[in-house]
């Protein structure tokens, strides 16, 4: 030790020294610190050999980064420590262990050489031995903080604090504490580069406070973890002891009893072979797993789903056609085709048994016609359970097929969930609003439904959650839609389309009388105070308070009347027992609708067209105005692309037939034609207004009026041929309601007349046409066709004299 003090004194006496440099990786050496260093680089070995051949003094300097070029002195810090090499030991792996002791801080003055080792000129930094009351106070604070750190730390030895407590020199105390703290290289180097002891102690106080906060938080976390581990171990030991006690007493523990009950349920559930094997396999995993394991609840939930699903339980089908027919007749008015189809299915099941595949019906019709309620009646007629799944707004394929069990919170798809609610394997399953399905990046649910609705595949439906084939073939699927256009073609191909058209006025009156009024009287507590609504009042409600093809809003209006009566009864006021048309304003307010009526006079340029929407049929007056201009055509009324093209075709037909119609062909270049379809706020589209547009344009050009009691529908070609259209039944009913008695329809639509009720057909005249030459004599008050050429059915032209057209009789069909 005397030699060491003498060496330090000699070093301190010199202003600068030239010494070899040992770069340190991920280490900062402090004065008085003794530490082993492991050296492998040739540059470092050369520096050590040079020091050993001299006075064993070497400058230990930390590298700024772990990976640097060996001779790159710019990556070395400028402040280091002179170290005395105590021992050098070569190891079997080729590295060298060097034991060094730090002595004094030095500042690098100049880098003298980098070959064969780094040599530098250094200036010794004299240690700061200043002593004051402030330094004494800081030493005490640092020691107190250091004591806390040593107590909280799991890695620092207890004698580290004892060693620090025995130091009286402030600089030595600061260096000792800094060398033992678990700091990164940057913070260690910052402490090394603080030459004034007061500043070093102040910085060390901050570092110790931060370290105390970290250690206390770590200690808190460790305690929490240990408590949980101890509790789990305690619970485990208690359960094991309880199990042993119960075994000694001949009792069964609850967990074992629960697992045994699960096993018995699996055996008794009459599962298919694959499902039973899967259930027993999962039960085996459950038995090997502690209840606290996260997977335990996942497997248990999966087994509950397997056991609660109906795998073989069925409802006995009704085998009496008369009973089924009576149920359908009591619950629904009309709908003859639908009822016949259901009775046919029951008859086939009676003859063929379970071998016949259940049909997949698609009820298509406007809102409120009874599609959903008809599904319930079908289930009642068949004696089966009824379940319903709404598909409106479903965008994710997983809604149909479910999620795999690898996902947190995974559940079966809505098909399997609904089957669990059904409780039997052969319910009537209604997929409501199938035309409202969507798709996005999560998949296409319509594609998943292809398997559900395919009788050849749905006996092995694959739900991702179950991961087992599930038999859907015994289900009678019924889908509902307002429109067929949005439904994917492959999906539509799997379904049998059953159209539910809108009700006519007389049907609505009968439905209200038989179903809606009794239902609302009971719902509003008027069974002891019954009321009646006259047929005239019902018709007035239908015509002016509702605008629909079904009866949903009609039921709301009847309910509104019943509620007003219920209030008067509750207030013990007088109320009418029979509702007449004159009372409707008092009960329902002013009527919001007014069905279109036929024009009260024959007009030029105004043709009556027959239209159809989801709310039913109606008539619309298409207007054409001719003004001086430059040959432009204007179309207004929010017309769609197809209807605009139809208007252009009608205009081209009129121009091509101008000579036959007595129109000056040059006139088209001097006029502007404006075609308008009223109710501009309502979008309109479709080709069926072609002949109506043509008649309106021809009337305006020839200045001949059109008959107000004639309505028409049909697509037009450039040669004047009339092509078939859709929605004829609703269009005829709408025109009939508007007071039209003569209707022009395409000849190819004659087959659709069977759908028109007989009582309506008897009161109207329907004229079937194939060409505009047949339309014009009936649509106009005076035939615009003059003596001249006329198109034949094959498109050729021939000179004819038109005969006088006699007006057809009511109830007739002109071919």
Curated annotation (Swiss-Prot):
It holds the Pfam family LON_substr_bdg. It catalyses: Hydrolysis of proteins in presence of ATP. One of its GO terms (cellular component) is cytoplasm. It comes from the Bacteria. Induction: By heat shock. GO terms for biological process: cellular response to heat; protein quality control for misfolded or incompletely synthesized proteins. It is found in: Cytoplasm. The active site is at 688, 731. Keywords: ATP-binding, Cytoplasm, Hydrolase, Nucleotide-binding, Protease, Serine protease, Stress response. InterPro entries: AAA+_ATPase, ATPase_AAA_core, Lon_bac, Lon_bac/euk-typ, Lon_lid, Lon_proteolytic, Lon_Prtase, Lon_prtase_N. ATP binds at residues 365-372. Its EC number is 3.4.21.53. GO terms for molecular function: ATP binding; ATP hydrolysis activity; ATP-dependent peptidase activity; sequence-specific DNA binding; serine-type endopeptidase activity. The keyword Zinc-finger does not apply. Belongs to the peptidase S16 family. ATP-dependent serine protease that mediates the selective degradation of mutant and abnormal proteins as well as certain short-lived regulatory proteins. Required for cellular homeostasis and for survival from DNA damage and developmental changes induced by stress. Degrades polypeptides processively to yield small peptide fragments that are 5 to 10 amino acids long. Binds to DNA in a double-stranded, site-specific manner. Homohexamer. Organized in a ring with a central cavity. HAMAP family: lon_bact. This is Lon protease 2. It comes from Herpetosiphon aurantiacus (strain ATCC 23779 / DSM 785 / 114-95).
């Amino acid at each position: 030790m005397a030699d060491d003090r003498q060496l330090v004194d000699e070093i301190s006496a010199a202003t600068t020294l030239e010494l070899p440099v040992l770069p340190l990786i991920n280490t900062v050496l402090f004065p008085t610190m003794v530490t082993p260093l492991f050296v492998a680089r040739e540059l470092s070995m050369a520096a050590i050999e040079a020091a050993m051949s001299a006075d064993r003094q070497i400058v230990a300097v930390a590298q700024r980064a772990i990976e640097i070029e060996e001779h790159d002195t710019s990556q070395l810090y400028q402040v280091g420590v002179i170290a005395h090499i105590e021992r050098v030991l070569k190891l079997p792996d080729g590295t060298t262990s060097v034991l060094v002791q730090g002595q004094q801080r030095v500042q690098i003055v100049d880098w003298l050489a980098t070959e064969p080792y780094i040599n530098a000129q250094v200036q010794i930094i004299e240690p700061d031995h200043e002593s004051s009351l402030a330094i004494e106070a800081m030493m005490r604070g640092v020691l107190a903080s250091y004591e806390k750190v040593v107590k909280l730390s799991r890695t620092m030895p207890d004698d580290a604090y004892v060693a620090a407590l025995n130091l009286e020199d402030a600089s030595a105390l600061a260096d000792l504490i800094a060398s033992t703290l678990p700091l990164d290289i940057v913070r260690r180097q910052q402490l090394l580069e603080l030459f004034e002891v007061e500043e070093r102690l102040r910085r060390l106080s901050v570092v110790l406070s931060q370290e105390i906060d970290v250690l206390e938080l770590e200690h808190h976390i460790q305690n929490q973890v240990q408590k949980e581990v101890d509790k789990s171990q305690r619970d485990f030991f208690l359960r094991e002891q309880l199990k042993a006690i119960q075994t000694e007493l001949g009792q069964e523990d609850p967990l074992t009893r629960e697992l045994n009950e699960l096993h018995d349920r699996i055996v008794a559930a009459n599962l298919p072979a694959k499902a039973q094997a899967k259930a027993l396999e999962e039960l085996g995993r459950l038995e090997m797993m502690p209840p606290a394991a996260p997977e335990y609840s996942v497997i248990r939930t999966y087994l509950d789903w397997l056991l609660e699903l109906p795998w073989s339980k069925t409802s006995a089908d009704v085998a009496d056609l008369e009973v089924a027919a009576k149920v359908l007749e009591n619950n629904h008015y009309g709908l003859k085709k639908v009822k016949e189809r259901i009775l046919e299915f029951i008859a086939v099941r009676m003859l063929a048994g379970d071998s016949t595949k259940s049909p997949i019906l698609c009820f298509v019709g406007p809102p409120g016609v009874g599609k959903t309620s008809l599904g319930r009646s079908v289930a009642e007629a068949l004696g089966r359970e009824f379940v319903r799944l709404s598909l409106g707004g479903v965008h994710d394929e997983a809604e149909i097929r479910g999620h795999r069990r690898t996902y947190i919170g995974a559940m079966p798809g809505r098909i399997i969930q609904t089957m669990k609610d059904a409780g039997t394997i052969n319910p009537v399953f209604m997929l409501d609003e199938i035309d409202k399905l969507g798709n996005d990046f999560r998949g296409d649910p319509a594609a998943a439904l292809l398997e559900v609705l395919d009788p050849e595949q749905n006996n092995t439906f694959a739900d991702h959650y179950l991961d087992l084939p599930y038999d859907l073939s015994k289900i009678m699927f019924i889908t509902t839609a307002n429109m067929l256009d949005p439904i994917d073609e492959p999906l539509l191909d799997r379904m049998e389309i059953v159209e539910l058209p809108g009700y006519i006025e007389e049907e609505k009156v009968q439905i209200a009388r038989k179903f809606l009024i009794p239902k609302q009287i009971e719902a509003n507590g008027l069974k002891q105070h019954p009321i009646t609504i006259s047929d005239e009042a019902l018709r007035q409600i239908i015509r002016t308070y509702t605008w629909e093809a079904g009866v949903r809003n009609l039921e709301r209006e009847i309910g509104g009347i019943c509620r007003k009566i219920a209030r008067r009864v509750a207030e013990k006021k007088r109320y009418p027992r029979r509702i007449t048309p004159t009372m409707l304003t008092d009960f329902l307010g002013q009527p919001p609708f007014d069905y279109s009526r036929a024009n009260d006079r024959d007009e030029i340029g105004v043709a009556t067209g027959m239209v159809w929407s989801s709310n039913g049929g109606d008539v619309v007056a298409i207007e054409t105005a001719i003004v001086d201009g430059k040959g432009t055509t204007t179309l207004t009324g929010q017309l769609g692309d197809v209807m605009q093209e139809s208007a252009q075709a009608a205009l081209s037909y009129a121009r091509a037939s101008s000579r036959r119609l007595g129109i000056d062909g040059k006139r088209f270049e001097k006029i502007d034609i404006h075609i308008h379809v009223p109710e501009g706020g309502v979008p309109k589209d479709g080709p069926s207004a072609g002949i109506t547009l043509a008649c309106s344009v021809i009337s305006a050009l020839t200045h001949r009026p059109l008959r107000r009691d004639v309505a028409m529908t049909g697509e037009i070609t450039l040669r004047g041929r009339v092509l078939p259209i859709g929605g004829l039944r609703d269009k005829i009913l709408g025109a009939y309601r508007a007071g039209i008695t003569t209707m022009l329809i395409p000849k190819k639509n004659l087959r659709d007349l069977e759908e028109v009720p007989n009582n309506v057909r008897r009161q109207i005249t329907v004229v079937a046409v194939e060409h505009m030459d047949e339309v014009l004599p009936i649509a106009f008050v005076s035939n615009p066709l003059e003596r001249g050429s006329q198109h034949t059915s094959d498109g050729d032209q021939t000179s004819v004299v038109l005969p006088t057209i006699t007006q057809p009789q009511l109830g007739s069909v002109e071919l």
